Design a protein with these regions (language model features):
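Single conserved hydrophobic/aromatic residue that forms the stacking wall/gate
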Residues: 1-6, 10
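Short beta-strand elements in bilobed, periplasmic/extracellular small-molecule ligand-binding domains
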Residues: 11-32
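Residues on one face of amphipathic alpha-helical coiled coils
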Residues: 12, 48, 67, 104, ...
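Short, high-confidence coil segments that cap the C-terminus of an alpha-helix
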Residues: 15, 49-51, 221
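Switch II of P-loop NTPase G domains
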Residues: 29-44, 229-251
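Accessory, often N-terminal, substrate/partner-engagement and coupling regions
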Residues: 40-111
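Conserved C-terminal guanine-recognition region of P-loop GTPase G domains, centered on the G4
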Residues: 60-70, 221, 244-251
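Conserved G1/Walker A P-loop phosphate-binding module
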Residues: 126-130, 134-145, 149-233, 237, ...
Length: 251
């Protein structure tokens, strides 16, 4: 269920969209998002196109995703999963990687039903399981422990960034934030104005971390210019936290 714009997003990620289905309905079906009949139609279309995965250009609840995969007999991804995958490919700093992993684990945790063995293989060693504990419970407990550690690590990293902002404010320089949609040319603008050397690529979310450089204006005044992670339409609410560094810099 992809718009043409969404198809471009997935092509940039190396996917090969082979078919597209569009549906208009007043409200999503609570069980399958598209309704059982439409889901069966998509399953037939996927078989004919020999598709490995069906991507929905919207958010699916854990139950909807689970039900769809049973009907479609193949992986069903939603918009959040794709954006998280893009984030994971582009995260380079310690904070960026931690924030992406945190968002991924929060996304996976309620989707553990029926996927315990698969997730345990993705995560490596699990450790000692308690008596009578199922694989699903072990995976859930492992993810919860990792979430707690990531939250603690990010608290420390954000404290450091907060101190850096205070230091910049004490310098009495005005701060200018470059804000816009992803892949709109924000990093290119920063490089052109300041010679910053920030990585520039023709792909979504190439920048995930705020970068600040000095810029001397023609009148002689020096300002601090900050490049930020780009926004995207229909950003899933659970991913707003991943933009925290940008929102704090702009604020």
């Amino acid at each position: 269920l992809l718009s043409s714009a969404a198809s471009d997003v997935y092509k940039r990620q190396g996917a090969d969209p082979v078919s597209r289905v569009v549906q208009k309905r007043e409200a999503p079906d609570p069980a399958t998002f598209v309704g059982k009949g439409k889901a069966s139609e998509i399953q037939e279309e996927s078989d004919q196109a020999d598709a490995d995965t069906v991507v929905f250009d919207d958010e699916l609840s854990p139950a909807q995703q689970f039900n769809l995969e049973k009907i479609l007999k193949r992986s069903a991804l939603d918009r959040t999963a794709v954006i998280l995958d893009i984030f994971a490919q582009n995260a380079t700093t310690l904070e960026g990687k931690a924030q992406v992993e945190l968002a991924q684990l929060k996304y996976r945790l309620p989707r553990l039903r029926g996927r315990g063995n698969q997730l345990s293989q993705q995560g490596g060693g699990i450790g000692t399981r308690g008596p009578g504990e199922t694989q699903l419970e072990v995976d859930r407990r492992r993810i919860q422990r990792r979430l707690a550690k990531l939250e603690k690590d990010l608290t420390g990293l954000r404290r450091t960034r907060k101190n850096q902002r205070k230091s910049r404010r004490r310098s009495r320089f005005h701060t200018v934030a470059i804000v816009g949609y992803t892949n709109a040319g924000k990093s290119t603008l920063l490089n052109r104005l300041t010679g910053a050397g920030v990585m520039v690529e023709d792909r979504l979310f190439a920048t995930l971390d705020a970068t600040t450089r000095r810029l001397q204006l023609p009148g002689g005044e020096t300002v601090l210019m900050t490049d930020t992670v780009g926004f995207i339409q229909k950003l899933p609410t659970d991913l707003v936290e991943a933009f925290k560094s940008t929102l704090e810099e702009v604020g």
